[in-house]
Amino acid sequence: VTETAGDIGGPPLAAGPRNPGAPEFPRLIQALRLLQERVTAADPPSDVVTEAAETLEKLSATLEPFSVSEAEQVAGHRLDLPGRGQALLPPYEVAEWDEHHVLAHVRLTRFYLGRNAAHGGVLCLLFDEILGRLANTGPSLARTAYLHVNYRGVTPIGPRLRLEASVDRVEGRKCFVSGRLHDGDTLTADAEGLFVSLLPGQP
């Protein structure tokens, strides 16, 4: 894997995450992803719902004293983990990455289900994540100015999908990127985006 992402993507993989967190952090995120799946698919009786809710409330209270700033948080900064260790993101895994192109794979699960297919908003999130990190390869921070997604077919839940993205051109502070999502040989969605580098002092 070749990866040299900027402020959104973080430091190069070889340098390691800014704050890797506790050794068991990957296990925590994996358990959270599994919980999302179980809750999505479950229709438990009232007593089980009550017990589960109370358990989750206790876990939230356990973690609350350890809240840190965005810059210090572990979730979202672990480039070595699927989806950067951010449970909101589909757990994509990078196969190839450089300044001009990315190849990644993702398996969308029931948590990301719309109606008999992947939720369209999830695909927007996935494209914004991958295209945004590609546009942020380098020292400058860029933000999404425009993102257009075309739904070319049904994106299924379950199969291993292929996601490719590339930088089409750069004009000053503007970076134009595009991406394609495939289920085997079938194009299920594509996207084009514009990301603009921030000026000094811009948040």
What is the role of each PLM region?
Residues 2-70, 155-157, 168-203:
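HotDog/MaoC-like acyl-thioester-processing domains
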Residues 49-117:
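Long amphipathic N-terminal alpha/beta scaffold segment
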Residues 97-101, 118-141:
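Active-site helix/loop of acyl-thioester processing domains in fatty-acid/polyketide metabolism
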Residues 99-103, 146, 160-162, 176, ...:
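Intrinsic-disorder/low-complexity, polar/charged segments enriched in Ser/Thr/Lys/Arg/Asp/Glu/Gln
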Residues 85-88, 142, 160, 172-174:
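Short solvent-exposed loop/turn micro-motifs enriched in small/polar/acidic residues
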Residues 3-16, 129-162, 195:
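Hydrophobic beta-strand-centered segment that forms part of the acyl-chain substrate-binding groove
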Residues 106-108, 151, 197:
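Hydrophobic residues in beta-strands and at strand termini
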Residues 95, 150-152, 164-168, 182:
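Conserved positions in beta-strands of structured domains
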